[in-house]
Design a protein with these regions (language model features):
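Conserved AAA+ ATPase "SRH/arginine-finger" region at the nucleotide-binding site
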Residues: 330-343, 350-364
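AAA+/P-loop NTPase substrate/partner-engagement loops
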Residues: 240-273, 281-285
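Phosphate-binding P-loop
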Residues: 182-185, 209-217
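C-terminal alpha-helical "lid" subdomain
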Residues: 352, 356-411
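Conserved catalytic/switch belt of AAA+ P-loop NTPases
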Residues: 267-268, 283-331, 337
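Pre-Walker A adenine-sensing motif
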Residues: 198-213
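Walker A/P-loop nucleotide-binding motif
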Residues: 197, 214-234
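AAA+ P-loop ATPase mechanoenzymes
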Residues: 1-195, 199
Length: 411
């Protein structure tokens, strides 16, 4: 059996890593192998389709990488076990199947375009075209497969550090259309860019560390004035601990009713998740209020052990209150009880962290720090004068205002 037919048989029998056959490049390559006995038009169509994909992905000279890297982002029993550091608990026959699959992936990755063309049943009919057909270069495999000798240590270490499935490729997600969707270009903000609010950030960081380490931790409400860095803190923390198995999923506040669906999708995953709800507030009779209350109180749709809820709000009390809410009527003798019920939701977050607008000195310290980070060549006096004028035009001082001012210096 030549290498091409052997490869076709091995790919046909993939088991643990069978999911890679749904990925575009391996799927197109397999379809090419299946067309080896078909008419020239069908074979050449499959060949051209694969070459087109490789060119579009910048892999025309990295065929081996394009094939093997799909295994790094596959979601299977071995990848999940390795992510949790429990691959040693897998049955021996599963481990053996993983090794066989890895051999199959490597066999496919090493095949050259010349070998495939030579194996075509009707090669004589296209011999005049073969010299001008595009050819791929094999190149090197993905690092975990480079020099594979039967040991799964490199692959296990990769999953342990990066996670499995789409959670290995992406670190930030959003709940949309009833499913978890990756965020292709997340905010890259990190902890080193912050100035001020050290006490508030340390509270959230310490709570997150306890969560990652499996210690006692709390759902967290970050509340206070707009533009003070509440959302940025959550995003920066998610970036800071991504290599510790932490992922962030943003849940739009108008989809809180979907919380049980989200729980079902992440509960069994060997990763930690922050469920992020931004700009949280409710109107009376809001069904989402009841859903979140049940989650925080530990109802049937309670959050799993591998998830925490981090919410931000401009309000300490999350249910908007109107004058009419304070008006007693004959029909409603429990107005006070209803008000207390509405105002108590925020108390169900175990950790509440307050962000207030900075003082003038704190505001200017933030400006100076950001200006230094960006390499601005201005004196503190010049920065202070410009920043204060900018803040007046923006309705007040805040970290957001400070950042916008520094950015405006480059416009």
């Amino acid at each position: 059996m030549n290498n091409v037919n052997k490869c076709k048989m091995l790919l046909s029998s993939l088991s643990v890593f069978r999911g890679i056959m749904n990925r575009s490049v391996p799927k197109a390559f397999y379809e090419l192998l299946l067309s080896l006995d078909k008419k020239p038009e069908e074979f050449l169509c499959a060949y051209g389709k694969l070459c087109s994909m490789l060119c579009e992905r910048g892999c025309a000279d990295k065929f081996a990488f394009a094939i093997s890297e799909t295994a790094l982002f596959d979601d299977n029993c071995f990848a999940r076990a390795a992510t949790a550091g429990r691959q040693g608990e897998l049955p021996e026959n599963v481990v053996s199947a993983v090794k066989t699959d890895c051999d199959a992936i490597l066999t496919a990755a090493k095949l050259t375009s010349d070998e495939v063309l030579e194996a075509y049943t009707y090669a004589d009919e296209i011999k005049e075209l073969i010299p001008i057909l595009p050819k791929w270069q094999t190149g090197k495999c993905a690092p975990c497969f480079d020099g594979f000798d039967g040991s799964l240590d490199k692959l296990s270490a990769y999953y342990k550090e990066n996670g499995c499935g789409m959670f290995a490729r992406y670190k930030a997600f959003i709940w949309r259309d009833g499913d978890i969707r990756p965020v292709e270009h997340p905010d890259r903000i990190d902890m080193d860019t912050f100035t001020g609010y050290e006490r508030q950030r340390s509270q959230v960081v310490n709570n997150t560390l306890s969560f990652i380490q499996g210690k006692s931790c709390n759902n967290c409400l970050l509340y206070g004035d707009k533009g003070t860095g509440k959302s940025s803190t959550v995003k920066a923390i998610a970036n800071e601990f991504r290599k510790d198995g932490l992922r962030i999923v943003e849940m739009p506040k108008d989809r809180l009713i979907d919380f049980p669906l989200l729980v079902d999708k992440i509960a069994a995953l060997p990763l930690k998740f922050i469920i992020f709800i931004d700009d949280l507030s409710f109107q009376h009779q809001d069904q989402s209020y009841t859903t979140l209350k049940a989650v925080l109180e530990g109802g049937l749709a309670a959050r799993p052990d591998n998830a925490l809820i981090y919410a931000t709000s401009n309000r300490r009390h999350l249910v908007k209150e109107s004058i009419s809410d304070r008006t007693h009527t004959v029909d409603d003798i429990n107005v006070r009880d209803n008000m207390q019920e509405s105002l108590s939701l925020s108390d169900r977050f175990g950790l509440a962290v307050c962000y207030t607008i900075p003082s003038k000195n704190d505001f200017l310290e933030i400006v100076y720090s950001l200006a230094e980070q960006r390499g601005v060549k201005m004196t503190h006096e010049e920065l202070a004068l410009g920043a204060e004028q900018f803040a007046l035009s923006r309705g007040g001082r805040s970290p957001r205002c400070a950042r916008q001012y520094v950015e405006s210096l480059f416009c």
